[in-house]
């Protein structure tokens, strides 16, 4: 826990916006998602292997996982990578991470997917 105080504004808790992912990564992911249906998961996994910090890629891997456990694992990795990214961008454990900011979609998609898959496997701690 930080010894630094959290500064509140008249607008409420601070808002954190993740940086936009590199255009090359977004292009590679778009190409992978446009592959024939039987190849999408493998192509997305290749993007994740090349860019393991990409929250959009982890979200896509979770979205295209072969089963609930594979989806859960991908979303969980993306969620934890997202927490690291949020902290690196000033988030201190509280405040807004809004869907309205497109660059937050990878993290928030992983969070949503993690919640859904955790529920499906009876993981109540999530």
Question: Each predicted region: which residue ranges?
Answer:
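N-terminal alpha-helical interaction modules that lie
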Residues: 1-56, 61-96, 102-105, 109-111, ...
